[in-house]
A protein has these predicted regions:
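Peripheral, solvent-exposed domain-edge segments
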Residues: 1-6, 10-40, 65-131
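Short, well-ordered loop/turn elements at secondary-structure boundaries
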Residues: 2-3, 49-51
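Surface-exposed coil/turn segments at beta-strand junctions on protein surfaces, enriched
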Residues: 32-34, 46-50
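Short, hydrophobic beta-strand segments
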Residues: 39-47
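Short strand->helix junction
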Residues: 46, 63-64
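Internal, hydrophobic beta-strand segments that form the core of beta-sheet-rich folds
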Residues: 51-63, 74
Length: 131
């Protein structure tokens, strides 16, 4: 099954977020596995807070276990305990086997376990100051 999974977040609060609004915040190289879903995703310490964001879980399966496809589930999320800020840049989720997504190359299809480090992703954040 393998390939690795990712959690991403979109801070857009007006309208529906597009695929370009999501930034990967955590990756689990050993996801998914057979059996109950018990995977953990460490969060970056500098993840900006938000009241009403959209998060996504994505998975690009290993070539040995599927056709050219990817899976993505979105859900409403809230981040507390941080400061107000805006993520600058960051890596986008892998969109594979879908219109406008990346293509497989000589090394096979792109997977989270080969294109991202395991665990919380490093984020560059512009912190917002209040007067």
């Amino acid at each position: 099954m393998g390939g690795g999974c990712a959690l991403s977040i979109a801070y857009k609060t007006v309208g529906k977020p597009s695929k370009d609004d999501f930034i990967v915040i955590s990756v689990n190289h050993n996801c998914p596995q057979l059996g109950p879903f018990t995977h953990s995703f460490p969060m970056p310490e500098n993840l900006p807070e938000c009241e009403a964001c959209t998060c996504a879980w994505t998975w690009v399966p290993d070539e040995r276990s599927s056709a050219d496809e990817m899976y993505m589930n979105t859900f409403n999320c809230k981040v507390t305990g941080g400061k107000k800020g805006k993520i600058q840049g960051g890596k986008k989720p892998i969109y594979f086997g879908v219109e406008g997504g990346v293509k497989g190359g000589k090394g096979g299809r792109p997977k989270y376990k080969t294109k991202f480090k395991n665990g919380a992703q490093k984020l560059k954040v512009q912190w917002l100051t209040t007067l």
